[in-house]
Amino acid sequence: MSIPFSNTHYRIPQGFGNLLEGLTREILREQPDNIPAFAAAYFENLLEKREKTSFDPAEWGAKVEDRFYNNHAFKEQEQVEKCEQELAKSSGREETPVTPFEESTEEEREQEEAAALKIQSLFRGHVAREEVKKMKSDKNENLKEEADN
């Protein structure tokens, strides 16, 4: 933060910006009439959640911000796992398992090649018919113009 025409810069504590971003997001989402009361309730809820899950979004946000500048903050695998668990709990939806890509058999490849060949030949035939139609219409227009003259 800076003041116009001043060389003074205030340092915002790590994680504080993340907390304010979360509050702002919720205020914009909920559109409360009494913003200070809503903010107090939001921070109370955040404190309760932090006590129950031992996950601090401010600390996590500070580490994310720190990672942007130097990549040493996320060497702790334990914190990342906690974050992933918290996100999985809060999202409320289950992730679908990833199925590995299976190679197609020789028979499937032959069928795919035959289908591709058929599609290509049909498209080429379509383009050729359109060209013939265009040539016929141009020829008819030329004959009409000659007949009119």
Swiss-Prot record:
<feature type="domain" description="IQ">
    <location>
        <begin position="112"/>
        <end position="141"/>
    </location>
</feature>
<dbReference type="GO" id="GO:0005737">
    <property type="term" value="C:cytoplasm"/>
</dbReference>
<dbReference type="GO" id="GO:0005929">
    <property type="term" value="C:cilium"/>
</dbReference>
<feature type="region of interest" description="Disordered">
    <location>
        <begin position="83"/>
        <end position="114"/>
    </location>
</feature>
<keyword id="KW-0472">Membrane</keyword>
<dbReference type="InterPro" id="IPR003117">
    <property type="entry name" value="cAMP_dep_PK_reg_su_I/II_a/b"/>
</dbReference>
<protein>
    <recommendedName>
        <fullName>Sperm surface protein Sp17</fullName>
    </recommendedName>
</protein>
<dbReference type="GO" id="GO:0009897">
    <property type="term" value="C:external side of plasma membrane"/>
</dbReference>
<dbReference type="GO" id="GO:0097228">
    <property type="term" value="C:sperm principal piece"/>
</dbReference>
<dbReference type="GO" id="GO:0007339">
    <property type="term" value="P:binding of sperm to zona pellucida"/>
</dbReference>
<comment type="function">
    <text>Sperm surface zona pellucida binding protein. Helps to bind spermatozoa to the zona pellucida with high affinity. Might function in binding zona pellucida and carbohydrates.</text>
</comment>
<dbReference type="GO" id="GO:0043005">
    <property type="term" value="C:neuron projection"/>
</dbReference>
<dbReference type="Pfam" id="PF00612">
    <property type="entry name" value="IQ"/>
</dbReference>
<dbReference type="InterPro" id="IPR047579">
    <property type="entry name" value="DD_CABYR_SP17"/>
</dbReference>
<dbReference type="InterPro" id="IPR012105">
    <property type="entry name" value="Sp17"/>
</dbReference>
<dbReference type="GO" id="GO:0035686">
    <property type="term" value="C:sperm fibrous sheath"/>
</dbReference>
<feature type="compositionally biased region" description="Basic and acidic residues">
    <location>
        <begin position="83"/>
        <end position="96"/>
    </location>
</feature>
<dbReference type="InterPro" id="IPR000048">
    <property type="entry name" value="IQ_motif_EF-hand-BS"/>
</dbReference>
<dbReference type="Pfam" id="PF02197">
    <property type="entry name" value="RIIa"/>
</dbReference>
<feature type="compositionally biased region" description="Acidic residues">
    <location>
        <begin position="103"/>
        <end position="113"/>
    </location>
</feature>
<comment type="subunit">
    <text>Homodimer. May interact with ROPN1.</text>
</comment>
